[in-house]
Amino acid sequence: MAAPSLLNWRRVSSFTGPVPRARHGHRAVAIRELMIIFGGGNEGIADELHVYNTVTNQWFLPAVRGDIPPGCAAHGFVCDGTRILVFGGMVEYGRYSNELYELQASRWLWKKVKPQPPPSGFPPCPRLGHSFSLYGNKCYLFGGLANESEDSNNNVPRYLNDFYELELQHGSGVVGWSIPATKGVVPSPRESHTAIIYCKKDSASPKMYVFGGMCGARLDDLWQLDLETMSWSKPETKGTVPLPRSLHTASVIGNKMYIFGGWVPHKGENPETSPHDCEWRCTSSFSYLNLDTAEWTTLVSDSQEDKKNSRPRPRAGHCAVAIGTRLYFWSGRDGYKKALNSQVCCKDLWYLDTEKPPAPSQVQLIKATTNSFHVKWDEVPTVEGYLLQLNTDLTYQATSSDSSAAPSVLGGRMDPHRQGSNSTLHNSVSDTVNSTKTEHTAVRGTSLRSKPDSRAVDSSAALHSPLAPNTSNNSSWVTDMLRKNEVDEICALPATKISRVEVHAAATPFSKETPSNPVAILKAEQWCDVGIFKNNTALVSQFYLLPKGKQSMSKVGNADVPDYSLLKKQDLVPGTVYKFRVAAINGCGIGPLSKVSEFKTCTPGFPGAPSTVRISKNVDGIHLSWEPPTSPSGNILEYSAYLAIRTAQMQDNPSQLVFMRIYCGLKTSCTVTAGQLANAHIDYTSRPAIVFRISAKNEKGYGPATQVRWLQDQEKDVGPWF
């Protein structure tokens, strides 16, 4: 986590769709990039289900059906895959619920479920303010507040510290409640506390952590329950413990539990005053507990002022949800302020990146021409942009002259026989791509819809432009992220070479020029920026030359973005090998760089890569078809199709694919038999895939190949071939 002074809060100020009313007592969960909110309220209890797409910055109201639950507040809300469970909560003043509902988010279908009661004892009583946590196939219910009175208008509160376990059925439905026999001292009764479950990487013993809450007075105690031994304990912690609080949020990212907001004691209270009599206020304090070392770290203190409104203002009863390494916060009540008979609630949506993004996958080639590359890389969740860099063996003049002048190429060489490395091809395509169709990438409609069996690849292309060169604050990327959709079951990526295929091409001669004035020469190991891109695709035809005396262009600090308008551009050269790497950027800065990929610009006269690859199953195996290159550069003499196969060599170097030719001829289709597929290599680096390559040959020889990753479902698709 970044140092407190480096926290880069982002307020989402631009969004579309029906924005939910501000509220408190609601709950939120995440399904991939979607934040799903239910319940809570202010002027009455809300019963709508609201969804926020964190990529498109769009709110929407799904058309739910089935046993739609009544609105509730301070309820339990957990997510298991695309299934959401709701338990308990307040349905109206003084009347609480102990009903359980299940939402299948893939169909937006509600169902009321009736778990079996415990073998001994009673099922949970109606309650609010309890914790409801999921781990594996079980939910864990602890504490809350019940109403002892049968008259909802005569509220007699009773704080609870009972503990239940709810076993779930796989996919849908539940088995029933049980009351585990626990050991050790049980935490005191409470409501509006938080509970999370964490399991260390080297441990098979998950633990539930309960923090804070309310029992007449706010609490600041931390409790731990070992879910294997069912033993309660009170771990000793280091660092400054957050103030006693309730109605706060606790979110786990990695090995850290982040605590934000809630009701806390007023800082001006008399220390001799009983906790029951002192005043309380909302806070915007922000801390985390390292769950491995049991050490608290304060990121924003309760006394820290925010005169610039650069972070969420104090609140309680809000919601927080973790998507990747990013935390989102929405709404909540603003202290004791009232408007008529209602609380004043916050309307704002904020997020905070808790760490730099991981390295993206290697850059992958979609299409190469004589003077450009269309490249992509796997998307990294919750990032604001990508820094793309390249390196070449060619040397260029490094000068600060007019960027429109084309610099001379020194000592230039073009080797038509040199090809890119196969290591750039083993990464799979990410599960989601932008809704703007990308060449050779199959796209389908709704992010939660079940997969169709159609396996066509759409070859229509739309390229994404880099950010403006003089961007000074990367917060502008937040509202520019485009909508994503799930990738279908086949994705095509052109390759840089076909194994065992020789490319016979004459090098295009070009002159060596000697500069009239002494200039610095870029060294081969220096990396130059191509630019900063909002999406995971880029059309590369130029790059920025390093200023004289600089070894690198981009800093790795917070929002350190170079002013590209001051730098000189260099065009790509035909028949030249370029190395690429990419890094993701978020509010914490620029993350680590990816592994290096190599691609070669086309030599004039050779055919382009085949396009619009389609795969369909038939009785003999599969049918593979494609369209001719859009730029054949003469007559196409033949096509070759190749299949990546299993070999002993691949066990030593899995990234080095070995290909077997399965077709050679003039037709733009072929049949791949089940016998050939039995020898196929399955690439498991991301999602299981069988890899094909297809290339075209004209009078000069073979051009670049199109690589096809046929994504496999391990049970459905891989099974018949093995």
Swiss-Prot record:
Q: Where is the composition biased (Polar residues)?
A: 419-436
tRNA-binding keyword on record:
no
Q: What is its main location?
A: cytoplasm
- Its domain of life reads Eukaryota
Q: Does the keyword Electron transport apply?
A: no
- Database matches in InterPro entries: FN3_dom, FN3_sf, HCF1/2, Ig-like_fold, Kelch-typ_b-propeller
Q: How does it assemble?
A: Binds KMT2A/MLL1. Component of the MLL1/MLL complex, at least composed of KMT2A/MLL1, ASH2L, RBBP5, DPY30, WDR5, MEN1, HCFC1 and HCFC2. Interacts with TASOR.
Q: Indicate what this protein is called per its UniProt record.
A: Host cell factor 2
Write the lineage as a comma-separated list.
Answer: Eukaryota, Metazoa, Chordata, Craniata, Vertebrata
